């Protein structure tokens, strides 16, 4: 399962390094075919493997890297304002880290675009699920499906909607966290 409880597939094999650390996991993903996931995406919750979303792993790494760059630039600004370093040293070190911040700006735009596409995809899936639930309600109302079948299907569809809502909320939080900061503007 993924971290939202969705079934990913059946594990077909696990590759480890000489220390026993998981390097990759092979999964039969049904109609999506075979998939190989890197070991850093796999965690264990109550002895069950859980796949971390690729967007989550990438955005966490992005936020960590960006946080370090921001701290350096802010520290440089403080050192300069407190006259701990000269303007020449400030400019030299700022220029050195400016390339990293420029990369951040490009990477930030790409990351935001990827996360927005994921939100859109989940929203479309939720809309399709809502429409399907409407169809189920209609069939139930006219007697085409029994109470038991209707309740089971509706409950399962509700679970899908809850998972999507949770992931959209998580994506929105990450999007808020990686929105371009005033920091990049201050340096330019």
Spans of model-derived segments:
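Peripheral interaction segments used for macromolecular assembly
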Residues: 1-186
């Amino acid at each position: 399962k993924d971290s939202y409880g969705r079934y990913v597939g059946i594990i077909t094999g696990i590759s480890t390094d000489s220390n026993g650390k998981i390097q990759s996991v092979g999964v039969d993903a049904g109609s999506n075919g075979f998939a190989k996931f890197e070991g850093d995406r796999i965690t264990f919750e109550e002895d069950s493997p859980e796949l971390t979303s690729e967007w989550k792993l990438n955005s966490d790494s992005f936020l960590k890297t960006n946080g370090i760059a921001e701290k350096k630039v802010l520290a440089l600004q403080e050192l300069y304002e407190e006259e701990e370093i000269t303007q020449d040293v400030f400019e030299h070190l700022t220029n050195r880290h400016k390339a990293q911040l420029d990369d951040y700006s490009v990477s930030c735009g790409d990351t935001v675009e990827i996360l927005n596409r994921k939100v859109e995809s989940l929203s479309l899936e939720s809309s399709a699920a809502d429409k399907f639930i409407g169809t189920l309600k209609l069939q139930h109302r006219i007697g085409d499906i029994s109470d038991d079948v209707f309740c089971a299907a509706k409950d399962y569809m509700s679970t899908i909607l809850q998972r999507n809502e949770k992931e959209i909320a998580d994506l929105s939080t990450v999007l808020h966290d990686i929105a371009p900061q005033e920091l990049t503007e201050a340096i330019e």
